[in-house]
């Protein structure tokens, strides 16, 4: 039973999948940092100094200075700024994945388009003999 599990676990596809999950998690962290630390500050500055992560609506009618203050006060809030950041992260992740898959598909097509190898010399000779025999009959 252990041998079967070992064969299953070490198959190329399963190992590739595990590596993909690990790299995906790491890439997700990079994309989140790209959105929150690189893209959103200049975008917020262009929008009048707004930090998108701090955009929220207080549902109890009380106004709070920031999302942190509202959360600390226990107020129910809709943190739509965090949602905007998440949507932008998703779009960037989806675009990156699209380009990776598109590149892989292009490479696969190039591999498939390679001409088939020449038949072995024996086959060529046998075909010639067959053709000569058919011609003489």
From Swiss-Prot:
<comment type="subunit">
    <text>Homopentamer.</text>
</comment>
<keyword id="KW-1133">Transmembrane helix</keyword>
<keyword id="KW-0812">Transmembrane</keyword>
<feature type="transmembrane region" description="Helical">
    <location>
        <begin position="81"/>
        <end position="101"/>
    </location>
</feature>
<keyword id="KW-0472">Membrane</keyword>
<dbReference type="GO" id="GO:0008381">
    <property type="term" value="F:mechanosensitive monoatomic ion channel activity"/>
</dbReference>
<dbReference type="InterPro" id="IPR037673">
    <property type="entry name" value="MSC/AndL"/>
</dbReference>
<keyword id="KW-0407">Ion channel</keyword>
<keyword id="KW-0813">Transport</keyword>
<keyword id="KW-1003">Cell membrane</keyword>
<comment type="similarity">
    <text>Belongs to the MscL family.</text>
</comment>
<dbReference type="InterPro" id="IPR001185">
    <property type="entry name" value="MS_channel"/>
</dbReference>
<keyword id="KW-0997">Cell inner membrane</keyword>
<keyword id="KW-0406">Ion transport</keyword>
<protein>
    <recommendedName>
        <fullName>Large-conductance mechanosensitive channel</fullName>
    </recommendedName>
</protein>
<feature type="transmembrane region" description="Helical">
    <location>
        <begin position="15"/>
        <end position="35"/>
    </location>
</feature>
<dbReference type="GO" id="GO:0005886">
    <property type="term" value="C:plasma membrane"/>
</dbReference>
<comment type="function">
    <text>Channel that opens in response to stretch forces in the membrane lipid bilayer. May participate in the regulation of osmotic pressure changes within the cell.</text>
</comment>
<dbReference type="Pfam" id="PF01741">
    <property type="entry name" value="MscL"/>
</dbReference>
<dbReference type="InterPro" id="IPR036019">
    <property type="entry name" value="MscL_channel"/>
</dbReference>
């Amino acid at each position: 039973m252990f041998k079967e599990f070992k064969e299953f676990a070490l198959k190329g596809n399963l190992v590739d999948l595990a590596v993909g999950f690990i790299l995906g998690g790491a890439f997700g962290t990079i994309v989140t940092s790209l959105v929150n630390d690189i893209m959103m500050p200049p975008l917020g500055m262009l929008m009048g100094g707004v930090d998108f992560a701090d955009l929220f609506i207080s549902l109890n009618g009380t106004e709070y200075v920031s999302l942190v203050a509202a959360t600390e006060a226990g107020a129910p809030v809709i943190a739509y700024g965090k949602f905007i950041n998440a949507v932008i992260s998703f779009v960037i992740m989806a675009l990156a994945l699209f380009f990776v898959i598109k590149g892989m598909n292009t490479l696969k097509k190039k591999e498939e388009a390679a001409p088939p190898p020449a038949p072995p010399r024996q086959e060529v000779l046998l075909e010639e003999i067959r053709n000569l025999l058919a011609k003489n009959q």
